Amino acid sequence: MNLTQLEIFSAVAACRGFTAAALQLGISQSGVSHAIEALEQEFGVSLLRRGKNPELTDVGARLLRQAQAMLGLAESMRQEASAARGMKRGTLRVGSFGPTASLRLLPPVLEKYRAAFPGIEIHVDEGPDSEVAQWLADYRVDVGFVTLPNEQFDTFFLMQDQLVALLPTGHPLTGKRSVTLADLCDSPFAMTRAGSGDIIGRLFHAAGLQPNIHCRSLQLVSTIAAVARGDAVSIVAESALPPESTHAYIKKPLRPAAVRKVALAVPDTGRMSPATREFIRIAQQVFAPSGTAGAKVKEKLPTVRQQV
């Protein structure tokens, strides 16, 4: 077993195919097949169920998590060595969710990070917040955006924004200065399954209320479209709304006010690579000048200096 074989195994699982993995890695399909067969022979188990779209076996899924952890540790070792030379090269994998993270938070951080460390190759994967959490747990990404509270990972607080009620133009509630959760239960409700979805669910549960869920959407744009058509009301994070104004919906403050806190998370601060540490440091400089970390992480991060 070697790291190349583990990298190929990880790529096949991510791409769900031998051909796609070969294209991604720039090797032949036969090379991919030989690597998987060599691992299966060494372990004495089948890692994949063969077919048009190969699927992991149960033991394959367990071994994949360990393989990804080993690959992450190997990359961390490379970056520790690179840091001693001024972090001139390396890889950083970032997990991002929704418009708030992908469109508002990530771009200014990436701009400063790339200016400081142009040799670090950055890969960004976007998905629902639940998927980002799974990527972190499986070590598929080095750092990811999450909402707080989050007890699963070590977190670094970045920002908070208001949750607002989203109403169709002409809805009876638009005449009110603020809207309660109980008010929203009288209309069909569009529930988002990304970003602030879990927070909204907890708000209703804590209030002992059950919204009349009309639809559930993975994409915020679908939720906004449902409101704009007049099909439903909803609750969204204010920072996730498009910057351009529209007359198709109206936002109203919630009463009592509710906020969403966004943070960066890592599986384990003890295994953070230098590239990850610097990404978090720059993000906190951009959005949290005080440098306050999240609930689990209090320490200051050591600076990695770029050598010339």
What are these regions (language model features)?
Residues 152-162, 176, 221-271:
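Beta-alpha-beta core module
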Residues 128-132, 137, 141, 195-250, ...:
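Hydrophobic hinge/microswitch elements
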Residues 91-151, 217:
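Central regulatory/effector-binding core of bacterial HTH transcription factors
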Residues 187-207, 272-280, 287-295:
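Secondary-structure junction motif
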Residues 86, 155-163, 167-189:
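Flexible hinge/capping segments at coil-to-helix
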Residues 42-43, 63-85:
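Alpha-helical linker/hinge and terminal dimerization helices associated
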Residues 11-26:
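Short helix-boundary/capping micro-motifs
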Residues 40-58:
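A short LG(V/I)-centered, amphipathic sequence patch enriched
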